[in-house]
Amino acid sequence: MQPVRHEVLTWADVDRLIDYLLPQFENEYDAMVLITRGGIIPGGMLAEAMGITHILTAAVDFPAQLEMERARLMAWPKFIQFPEDSLLSGRRTLVVDDVWGSGRTITSVRNRISTAGGLPATCVLHFNPYRNLFGNARPDYYSAITDAHIVYPWEIDRGADRALLDRTPQFPS
């Protein structure tokens, strides 16, 4: 098994990814659902650029994931936070996250919006088709395809990614 490749992005990189997304949108959207936590910042940037003011959030967990992985099954999502159906019904809704890895989280949110009567489209900065659990399914909009673990600039000062950055070679100025 190959080691996971990491890619550390700057704020300028994120700006370029957002700029790449904007001309792709074929429809106007009435609402946006930002998936916590990864979709908050790119979703906010997109909402500002697109003039979307009806902004909602969704938080999803897969609590039984370890047991399910051992059995090679998919865990059911637990929605920790989700907008009421009345806020989604009949609305063209853009669902935003930072990355489509396995696709479980954004697919769960998209399906729940559809069940509520909304008209969802999915949008991510990075699409990883190599981890995708949903066959040929892919985000409606994405900036880049990757096989790397992406470290966004809002993630670099905390958690496990801090150790990654500490290993980055420093060059004399």
Give residue ranges: language-model regions.
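PRPP-associated nucleotide enzymes
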Residues: 1-173
